């Protein structure tokens, strides 16, 4: 029986010529046309056993493909050009792709020009970008490849600080391509991360490119209040949909977002004060009751920092309290801080670096009702007095911006709204131009290079230029807004000395 001889890495395999003649595949057709009878055909880049598997497929239309042999069979099928086997191998690889092998499969798909596998592995990288940074192959991605990945609209980053950490880890392996840092959008980064990048000697150029990463755009949580039940909804710029997260039957509560969970703190149910704190995961929509606070209270002030939820002051029945305590996310124990110097409810609290600033609100007992203008700072495990606000305010909203505090006041007893800036290093207050007036409740948060205010309309205040933008929007019956991101960048005063520790903490928090 006449045979065709193949040589693979010095090993000989003889194939019945009838199999070659009957083959519909181009590789074997060319052999029929050009084969020299007594010469072995040398096959390079093909595994001997993989070639045997292809021959079995040609004979019986069956082939044994496993996760262990799929790559060598696919390589052989690509070189020999056996499309049905290529398809079977690609399906097997796509079915088994995960965050630990997606970069290897991505590189494999490029090497052999397999588009379906390329798309699938790219999708896996995009969905698991923080996990794949631990892969030794991550640093071998080209600058253009990483730029493409991080510019994809669905890349799974929830804060631009996370994008920055991904880039810094890649730059560590590719120091000649530091200009990739320019894909960052500084206005979506925290001041702490911007300072860290500056201390590394890296400069982010001003960009006019559109923001493509949907995940870094601010998500919005809205609690729409009614007389008895408040509805919580969540808007994701990634999906561009509003979804109902759940309901709460509380009044006079406070709310804050930490690590993708909305905390509903204190308040009243059926005119009774409550200890409890409820938490809803904004992705899974699952509710959980966390450990009770130390006392019954409503109208507390809250702030978050370094993975902790801080609850300060509040109203215990008809008396203001000076209790300050915090709960670390994922734990069940409240930690008490020293009490405020002046008990209060309805004040504002905000972190600057690792210090808490509390201002305004109301001090009340059974005999007294005093609207406050005083300011306290918790630093080095004690409360100290700071310069008071220019006026007394019972409703105060405060945000940190570029190391200073901006305060907008609401209206109860006051006749108008005010905007103040507190210069932290100078312990000094200055009054700024206020665009709107006669608004009671509102939402205020820092959004990159501007401060967002949602009141009777949507406003953007730009501190550096002291200018305002106005956008019409309906805010009827909506009394609480919050913008949130999944991750909390550790807030600290980053210096050359503390920079390695800061970056190490960020890497542990964001990329592991």
From Swiss-Prot:
Matching Pfam families: BACK, BTB, Kelch_1
Superkingdom, taxonomy of origin: Viruses
Ranges occupied by Kelch repeats: 216-261, 262-307, 309-354, 356-403, 405-449, 452-498
InterPro entries: BACK, BTB/POZ_dom, Kelch-typ_b-propeller, Kelch_1, SKP1/BTB/POZ_sf
Keywords in alphabetical order: Early protein, Kelch repeat, Repeat
SS bonds (residue pairs): none
Domain BTB: 2-67
SMART domains, per database record: BACK (SM00875), BTB (SM00225), Kelch (SM00612)
Similarity comment: family membership: Belongs to the poxviruses Kelch family.
PANTHER family xref list: KELCH PROTEIN, KELCH-LIKE PROTEIN 8
Protein name: Kelch repeat protein C2
Species in which this protein is naturally found: Vaccinia virus (strain Copenhagen) (VACV)
Lineage of the organism: Viruses, Varidnaviria, Bamfordvirae, Nucleocytoviricota, Pokkesviricetes
């Amino acid at each position: 029986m006449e045979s065709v001889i193949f040589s693979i890495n010095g090993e000989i395999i003889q194939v019945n010529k009838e199999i070659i003649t009957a083959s519909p595949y181009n590789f074997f057709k060319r052999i029929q046309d050009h084969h020299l009878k007594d010469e072995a055909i040398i096959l390079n880049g093909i595994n001997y056993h993989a070639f045997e598997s292809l021959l079995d497929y040609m004979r019986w239309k069956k082939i044994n493909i496993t996760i262990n042999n799929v790559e060598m069979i696919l390589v052989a099928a690509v070189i020999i050009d056996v499309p049905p086997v290529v398809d079977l191998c690609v399906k097997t690889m796509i079915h088994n792709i995960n965050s630990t092998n997606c970069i290897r499969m991505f590189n494999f798909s490029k090497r052999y020009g397999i588009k379906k596998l390329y798309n699938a592995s790219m999708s896996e990288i995009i969905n698991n970008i923080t996990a794949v940074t631990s892969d030794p192959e991550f640093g071998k991605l080209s600058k253009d490849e990483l730029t493409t990945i991080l510019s994809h609209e669905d890349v799974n980053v929830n804060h631009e600080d996370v994008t920055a950490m991904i880039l810094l880890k890649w730059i560590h392996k590719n120091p000649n391509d530091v200009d990739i840092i320019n894909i960052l959008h500084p206005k979506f980064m925290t001041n702490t991360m911007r300072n860290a990048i500056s201390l590394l000697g890296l400069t982010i150029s001003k960009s006019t490119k559109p923001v493509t990463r949907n995940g870094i755009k601010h998500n919005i949580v809205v609690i729409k209040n009614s007389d008895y039940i408040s509805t919580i909804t969540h808007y994701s710029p990634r999906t561009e949909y509003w979804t109902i997260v759940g309901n709460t039957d509380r009044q006079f509560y406070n709310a804050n977002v930490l690590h993708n969970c909305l905390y509903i703190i204190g308040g009243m149910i059926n005119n009774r004060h409550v200890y409890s704190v409820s938490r809803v995961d904004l992705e899974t929509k699952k509710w959980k009751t966390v450990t009770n606070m130390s006392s019954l209270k409503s109208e507390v002030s809250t702030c978050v920092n370094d993975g902790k939820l801080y609850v300060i002051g509040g109203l215990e029945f008809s008396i203001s309290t000076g209790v300050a305590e915090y709960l670390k996310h994922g734990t069940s124990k409240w930690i008490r801080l020293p009490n405020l110097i002046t008990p209060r409810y309805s004040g504002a609290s905000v972190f600057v670096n690792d210090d808490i600033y509390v201002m305004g609100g109301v001090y009340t007992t059974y005999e007294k009702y005093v609207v406050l203008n005083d300011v306290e700072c918790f630093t080095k495990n004690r409360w100290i007095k700071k310069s008071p606000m220019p006026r007394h305010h019972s409703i105060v909203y405060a945000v940190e911006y570029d190391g200073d505090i901006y305060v907008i006041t609401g209206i109860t007893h006051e006749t108008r709204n005010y905007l103040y800036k507190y210069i932290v290093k100078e312990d000094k207050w200055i009054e700024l131009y206020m665009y709107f007036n006669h608004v009671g409740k509102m939402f205020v948060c820092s959004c990159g290079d501007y401060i967002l205010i949602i009141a009777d309309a949507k406003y953007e205040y730009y501190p550096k230029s002291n200018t305002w933008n106005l956008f019409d929007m309906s805010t009827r019956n909506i009394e609480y807004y919050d913008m949130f991101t999944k991750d909390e960048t550790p807030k600290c005063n980053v210096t050359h000395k503390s920079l390695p520790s800061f970056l190490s903490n960020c890497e542990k928090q964001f990329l592991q």
